Amino acid sequence: MSDSTFIQRIARWAVLPAAIGLGFGLSAFSAPAAEAATHYCNGYKATIVGTNGADDIEGTSGRDVIVGLGGNDEIDGNGGDDIICAGSGHDEVDGGSGNDYIHGGSGHDSIEGGSGNDRIYGSSGNDHVEGESGKDKVYGNSGHDLVEGGTGKDKVSGGSGNDTVKQRYASDREEDRWEDRY
């Protein structure tokens, strides 16, 4: 390799980081947004996409469609009527405020709906699903789940498996409807 070839290679590698840093600004770090076009949650195109590693994903104050993919993720929907699919891994999900749709995916997940009228679905793992406040629909699905309605008039089902359904608020006892048909 001649000296001029070596210098050209260095110049090419030096220009690339500068172009990324100056020409594209922070958008150079938006790889999840580029991937969002290929991922869907409950039929909606994702606006925020995690990776196959362990991610800490924060939604916005508006409506988000979040797909966690693999890994043991921590997902916070924050505000808005969010649609969240946690994906595989042992995930922790908090829907935040708003009327959210949350699906845990495979793995042993911990899901809290937050405030609002939420629809929450565990999946094949041993999940802890909790509606919190609002008129929620909470489903453990398969696995040995802990299912809690929270405050409000809730519809709760453990699904198949050896489940525990917990009533946290005595004043709410007459409001909730338990639906296990397995």
Residue ranges of predicted features:
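Bacterial N-terminal signal peptides that target proteins for export
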Residues: S4-P17
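N-terminal segments that cap or nucleate solenoid repeat domains
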Residues: E35-D81, R181-Y182
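Consensus positions within tandem repeat domains that build extended binding/scaffold surfaces
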Residues: A54, R63, N72, D81, ...
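Glycine-centered beta-turn/loop sites at beta-strand termini
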Residues: C41, G50, G59, G68, ...
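Short, low-complexity, Pro/Ser/Thr/Gly-rich segments in the mature regions of secreted, periplasmic
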Residues: S160, T164-Y182
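C-terminal segment of classical bacterial N-terminal signal peptides
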Residues: L22-A33
